[in-house]
Amino acid sequence: MQLNWKESGLRWYWVVVVVFLADQLSKQWVLANFDLYESVKLLPFFNFTYVRNYGAAFSFLHDAGGWQRWLFTAVAVGFSVLLTIWLRKQPANMVRLNLAYTLVIGGALGNLIDRLQHGFVVDFLDFYWNTAHYPAFNIADAAIFIGAVLIIIDSFKASSSDDKAIKE
């Protein structure tokens, strides 16, 4: 039986819009107000630092010659379409999984727009301790990470409840 959009996980698509807009507006602000590598200290462990990421997480494949832009574009589109199809099939009351999927989609689309528009992703959230810096990231990256963690948690919760059902 097909669920209509109100009964399905598509009801959660507003999260995609919120993540996408927050990500894109924050990146536009950085581009308008920072020079490349400019840094502003906000807290003793946190800066806004404008950097360009030509790769994926942790600058993976950043120096691969340009083809990686299209690979990451295809991956973002593919995952966004796949997760949207899954949302369509999910009941709206599966909160954790629907939230996870929409966070990943919003983040993937935010970084996709950067890749298509600039050829790189704008990163600016810079956490550090003393001289050790975590790689800079953005709101889209954070949404993807949180969504992935929620998917993992959901898979453990689901397998745990499956185990209980088998024992009964």
Curated annotation (Swiss-Prot):
GO terms for molecular function: aspartic-type endopeptidase activity. Its main location: membrane. It catalyses: Release of signal peptides from bacterial membrane prolipoproteins. Hydrolyzes -Xaa-Yaa-Zaa-|-(S,diacylglyceryl)Cys-, in which Xaa is hydrophobic (preferably Leu), and Yaa (Ala or Ser) and Zaa (Gly or Ala) have small, neutral side chains. GO terms for biological process: proteolysis. GO terms for cellular component: plasma membrane. This protein specifically catalyzes the removal of signal peptides from prolipoproteins. This is Lipoprotein signal peptidase.
